[in-house]
Amino acid sequence: MCSFRGRGGRAAGPAAPGFPDVHHRNRAGERDIPGLAPTVAGRSRRPGADPTRCFNDPMSTIDFAPSERSRLGLEWEIACVDRRSGELSPAAPDLLARLGPATEFPHVTGELLTNTVEIVSAPHHKAAHAVADLTRMVERIHRLAEPMGVQLMSSGTHPFSQWFQQQVTPGNDRYATLIDRTRWWGRQMMIWGVHVHVAVDDRDKVLPIVDGLLTYLPHFQALSASSPFWSGETTGYASNRALMFQQLPTAGLPPHFRDWAEYESMVADLMHTGVIDVLSELRWDIRPSPRWGTIEVRTFDGISTANEIGAIAALTQCLVEHFSRELDAGRTIPVLQPWFVRENKWRTARYGMDAIIIQNPSGDERLVTDDLRALVRALEPVAADLGCTAELLDVLAIIDHGASYQRQLRVAQATDGSLKAVVSSLVRELLDGRPDRSRPSPDDPSVTQARSGRAD
């Protein structure tokens, strides 16, 4: 089994601009397994699953697939909405039937709810090429959806649809088991996100890079925050999705692992006790994806524009490549204490771009947008090597013009609280591929059906 090089100690010389000073991270591995409300022998397991398979042997290993360094792939969850009402529409099964089998990349798949489709790009070296996959598939889905009276949008949550009116995708044992186990919280998962995979060329690097990326989780979350509303209410949070999703027992922040063997041991424990049946049921905000040889960042709220997806993809790719170079050079990766990581997640879920985050183990603080500007400058040489400079610089445009949650709140304010107007703006953004910075009038006929902060 592997142990990791480059962990511990202070880096020689001052920290680079935009990167916190490096200290040794000292925390015990978190091995808390939630108590399960018993259904069958204390566990809820997929029908027909073998509780002894694969990971009952403590010597079992999890192979990390070979992959081309820093290639990336994108997954974009998209909601189907009714053209007239703006409500969520259970149109995904019909759309998927019209699209045909997902046999190659890029492709479209179903998700937990029948109102959702997910677009998966092919792996690419350049962020722009992965984003182009997504936009081509969006155009194809839109052409099929339009005659059905269905429109497409992406945000962390829907502004006013009700969770209890949504349908779970039938015929999927994994989804049925999730809902059976998690009940009320599982049914509340009316949320959407973007996932960014970046390939890592050496398994020994994976867990240190995951730890390093957790330092930048608040940056990811602030840039993508797009869920200020829930069931017709203004929540006061930039990313309500971030706090909703972590209610699932295997979601939220990942534990710290000393090495790959400890990660394998934890997976064996969870398999043996029925907490998970397959590795993908570990739904952490940032996680290893051994099947693809990648690290998967799942922190991002649903993003309504291809332009912004390119920005967060480039930022993620550049950080992973930067950390990989640091490890190659024998240097350590900056990490934070787990209590600071948790606090940063809450702060940016609550305050978004106005959050003051904890930068380093010493507890120094800084406005997240100021730290993002410095981070972009520090990563520009890496971006030049990866061919994603333009996409990385789009991070600055999000800072200057506002993240999705800010735009949604502005639309609601400009239209006397119309959440249907918010949905309309999200639909326009997805089709245009760029943020909608217009301010609709309260007299716009597309928004007169809904006022007072709720949809009529």
Residue ranges and their predicted role:
Residues 1-52:
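Compositionally biased, low-complexity flexible segments
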Residues 57-148, 178, 245-456:
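C-terminal accessory/tail domains of diverse enzymes
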Residues 124-191:
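Well-ordered mid-protein domain cores that form the structural environment of catalytic cofactors
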Residues 134, 172-181, 200-221, 304-317:
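Helical (often loop-to-helix) elements that flank the catalytic cores of nucleotide-handling enzymes
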Residues 158-162, 227-237, 332-340:
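Short proline/glycine- and acidic-rich turn/helix-capping motifs at secondary-structure junctions
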Residues 164-176, 236-249:
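Short, low-order "capping/linker" segments at domain edges
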Residues 196:
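An acidic/histidine-cluster motif and surrounding catalytic segment
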Residues 203-205, 211, 221-242:
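Glycine-rich, mobile lid/loop segments that gate access to catalytic sites or pores
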